[in-house]
From Swiss-Prot:
Residue numbers carrying Phosphoserine: S82, S191, S192, S194, S196
Keyword Phosphoprotein among record annotations: yes
InterPro entries named in the record: Fam133
Keywords noted in UniProt: Phosphoprotein
Species: Homo sapiens
Biased composition (Basic residues): 89-102, 128-140, 222-239
Biased composition (Low complexity): 103-119
Organism superkingdom: Eukaryota
GO MF terms held by the record: RNA binding
Claim: NADP is one of the keywords in the record: no
Residue span of region Disordered: 19-38, 70-247
Gene: FAM133B
Record-given protein name: Protein FAM133B
Length: 247
């Protein structure tokens, strides 16, 4: 059995397009655009002049609008001026009426005003005094509260420090005791186990005191020995210096 032939004939697309001939395009071509009718230079000048002049109808419409706008502005100004004049006249009338009424009631109002002003000033002084007292009391209370808070904080801090020191000392003593128990467990296992912790701590402190006293005694002995040696050396030097002078 032979293989099937799957080959396809190659067709050149350019050659196929040429064989079909020119395409019938719908619409204007590039040549139509290039060959379009164009105005002469004189016609262009006329169009530009017309644009500069503008249309007569638009100019007439603008003139009418301007006239109407001017009339409206004048009316509005007249209204404002008349309103301002009337308001100024009303104010002047009110001032005159107040002056007339003030002349008649000046004598009666002066006495009442003086009494009311004095009473108002006294009330204000009392209110200010009360406010000052309240402010002083508040400041005094706040200072006392702050002082008490600081004292309580300092006491708490001292207590905490003491507790921490006691705890550290106890821990150190317990650690030292545990080490010494391990060291001396072979020699005296029963005595260390039978005693309570407090008694054992006292014994350890007594032993520490004894060891410190023994160390002090040993240092004193060594100092005495050194002094004795220096004294003997001085005696020998004196004897050696005096021996050649004697014959």
């Amino acid at each position: 059995m032979g293989k099937r032939d799957n080959r396809v004939a190659y067709m050149n697309p350019i050659a196929m397009a040429r064989s079909r001939g020119p395409i019938q395009s719908s619409g204007p071509t590039i040549q139509d655009y290039l060959n379009r009718p164009r105005p002469t230079w004189e016609e262009v000048k006329e169009q530009l002049e017309k644009k500069k002049k503008g249309s007569k109808a638009l100019a007439e419409f603008e003139e009418k609008m301007n006239e109407n706008w001017k009339k409206e502005l004048e009316k509005h100004r007249e209204k404002l001026l008349s309103g301002s004049e009337s308001s100024s006249k009303k104010r002047q009338r009110k001032k005159k009426e107040k002056k007339k009424s003030g002349r008649y009631s000046s004598s009666s109002s002066s006495s009442s005003d003086s009494s009311s002003s004095s009473s108002d000033s006294e009330d204000e002084d009392k209110k200010q005094g009360k406010r000052r007292k309240k402010k002083k009391n508040r400041s005094h209370k706040s200072s006392e509260s702050s002082m008490s808070e600081t004292e309580s904080d300092s006491k708490d801090s001292l207590k905490k420090k003491k507790k921490s020191k006691d705890g550290t000392e106890k821990e150190k003593d317990i650690k030292g005791l545990s080490k010494k128990r391990k060291m001396y467990s072979e020699d005296k296992p029963l005595s260390s186990e039978s005693l309570s912790e407090s008694e054992y701590i006292e014994e350890v402190r007594a032993k520490k005191k004894k060891s410190s006293e023994e160390r002090e005694k040993a240092t004193e002995k060594t100092k005495k020995k050194k002094k004795h040696k220096k004294h003997s050396k001085k005696k020998k030097k004196k004897a050696a210096s005096s021996s050649p002078d004697s014959p």
